Each structure stands twice: as C-alpha cells, then as structure tokens.
Regions:
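Glycine-/small-residue-enriched transmembrane alpha-helix faces in small-molecule transporters
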Residues: 1-61, 66, 105, 109, ...
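Cytoplasmic-side transmembrane-helix entry/capping segments in multi-pass membrane proteins
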Residues: 30-33, 85-95, 141-153, 171-175, ...
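Helix-helix packing/entry segments at the starts of transmembrane helices
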Residues: 33, 37, 61, 118-126, ...
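Hydrophobic transmembrane alpha-helices of multi-pass small-molecule transport proteins
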Residues: 38, 70, 93, 125, ...
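Specific alpha-helical transmembrane segments that line the substrate/conduction pathway
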Residues: 57-68, 99-100, 104-141, 146, ...
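Specific transmembrane alpha-helical segments of multi-pass solute transporters/efflux pumps
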Residues: 39-44, 71-123, 157-160, 240-258
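Membrane-interface helix-cap regions at the ends of transmembrane helices
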Residues: 42-48, 53, 66-84, 105, ...
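C-terminal-most transmembrane helix of multi-pass membrane proteins
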Residues: 2-19, 63, 220, 232-234, ...
Length: 314
C-alpha cells in the first residue's frame, strides 16, 4: 500500500483515483464485515434455544449443512475451491480446531463457570490483539490509530455487555474463548490469498463437521440426532445459513479487503446487534450504560475504519 501511494503521488489524478479506489474497497469490506457481525450478534437469542439440546451433534449438523451450502454457492458462482497444499492444511485445520471446535466447546462447557457476559467481554477484547498481530502477519507495522480504536471499542463493548460473574475456571474458559476468536481471523491471513473467502469457509466447515460428528458420537451417543426437537432443527438451520455460510464468507471477505487489524474493529457491532435484537424480541429496553457503550463503540469504529492511516510495510 505504501509503495502504491508513492507511485501515485507525482500525478494528482492518479492519487485521486487511488484514494477513490481505496475508499471504495474499504467501504465494501466494512459493509461485508458489518453484515457478518449483525448475523452473529442477532443469533444470540437463537443459540439459547439449543441450551438443552445435544450441542455437539447439533454443531456437527450445522457445519455439515453450511459446507454443502457453500459448495453449492461456489459452483453456481464459478468460485474455485482448491485443494490445500502442504502447510495450508495446518492453517485451515487450525482455524477449524480453534475458531470453530474449541471455541464452541469452551462456550458450552464454560457456561457452568461463567455468565455469558464474561465470554462477551473476552470476544470484545480480541480487536486489540488483531490490531497488533494482524498487520504483523501481513508483514506490515500496526497502525497506531487502529490500535487506539480497538481499545476504545473494547471499552464500549464491555459497557454494552456488562462484566458478568465467574469463578477461577470461568476465567480460564474466557481466555480460551479469547484465543480461539483471535485465531479464527489470524490463521486465515496466510491462506486467504489463494483460497479466498469461500474456499477458506468450505474447508474449515467440513473439517469442523467431521470433528463435531466424532465428539457427538462419543459424548452424546450415535442416536443423539433423534433427540433434537423441531425448535432445535430450526435453530441449527438458522445457524448453518446465517451465522456460518453467510457470515463466514462476509467476514473473510472483509479481512481480505481491510486486513485483519481494521476488520477486527467490526466485531464491536456484534454486541450491539445482540442488544437491539433482544429489544425487538420484546426484551427490556437498554439501560443508559448500554447506550453509552453503543456510543463508544460507534466512536471507535469511526476512528479506526475510515480510510486514511493504514499499516506501513515492514
């Protein structure tokens, strides 16, 4: 990016075209990421319906269905799904293992030791890590404004969700959730260039489906699928379509266009979407502290997403 600016600098029209193109790419990437986070945040109420279901079996079905949908989408749109090479298997398996499998296991098993808000704050803290580690993986220096925006956004998200209560084990689960959420984005950086958003999503979902199928058979029994109610099937279907097939492609499209650092800022939209969805579903009106948190999140997004200072090449 730095080199492109240097080449364009001598010609004013070139500079204008570059800035216009960069702003357009930033806008499209931001919209893609925002839509992904709205899907994720809006799914909170749906996820709660699976609390008493055989969760590993449901997750296996979710990712299997999402993978089939993604393959159909790739075929219709002419998007190639390439076979991973050598080290790419490690990156893709790492995404599936951490961001999809361990993340969901931590949420399910950690619910006994921590309130949902604890995990929400853990996820809300990820943008600060992405703002630093993302550019380094992309062989750039972190942008100070993005790092500052990530800190502001994390504070705002904490106000929106509250801190919650947990025991010592709960803090451990929260740390696992934090690491897995970061890995979901960071481990994709080396493979997005060759596989694209659709390819990465296809490979990670089928790997996760296989792992959850094994977990479900071992921990819940091969007949667990018969215990899923109609509501469980509907919730699983929604998660497969909206929160996996659609959200994954939108999110990785965002990461490819904005970079992991700035894309991470958009995770702040998820708790806002969750709060507003709760209100729409006849939940209580947000308290003043929540509205203050929403304002802080918006300020963080405005500071970090707008086109301007970006990471510089190492």
């Amino acid at each position: 990016m730095t080199a492109n600016r240097a080449l364009a600098a001598p010609v004013s029209t070139g500079t204008g075209a570059y800035r216009s193109g960069a702003a357009w790419a930033t806008g499209r990437g931001a919209v893609a990421g925002a839509l992904a986070m709205v899907c994720v945040g809006g799914s909170v109420a749906v996820t709660g319906t699976l609390a008493k279901a055989p969760v590993y079996t449901a997750e296996g079905l979710r990712y299997a269905a999402a993978c089939l949908l993604l393959l159909a989408f790739a075929r219709v749109c002419g998007r190639p799904v390439r076979l991973p090479r050598a080290a790419e298997w490690l990156w893709l398996s790492g995404i599936a293992a951490t961001g999809l499998v361990v993340f969901n296991v931590a949420l399910a098993d950690g619910a006994r030791d921590a309130e949902p808000a604890v995990f929400g704050v853990a996820v809300a803290s990820v943008p600060a890590l992405l703002a630093v580690a993302g550019p380094l993986l992309e062989r750039s220096r972190p942008a100070p404004r993005t790092v500052l925006a990530a800190v502001v956004l994390t504070c705002g998200a904490a106000l929106v969700q509250g801190l919650g209560r947990c025991n010592a084990a709960g803090y451990g689960w929260a740390a696992v959730v934090f690491g897995c959420e970061a890995a979901f984005t960071l481990l994709a950086v080396p493979v997005l260039g060759r596989h694209g958003a659709v390819g990465v999503s296809v490979h990670t979902t089928w790997i996760a489906a296989v792992v959850f199928a094994v977990l479900g058979a071992v921990r819940e029994g091969p007949a667990a699928v018969a215990r899923l109610s109609a509501a469980d099937w509907l919730a699983t279907g929604y998660l497969a379509v909206g929160v996996t097939a659609v959200a994954f492609v939108r999110w990785y499209t965002c990461v490819g266009r904005l970079g992991a650092g700035r894309a991470g800022l958009l995770t702040g939209i998820a708790p806002i979407a969750a709060t507003l969805t709760g209100v729409l579903l006849s939940g209580p009106a947000p308290r003043p502290m929540v509205w203050a948190g929403i304002a802080v999140v918006i300020a963080g997004l405005a500071l970090g997403i707008r086109n301007g200072e970006g990471p510089s090449t190492l």
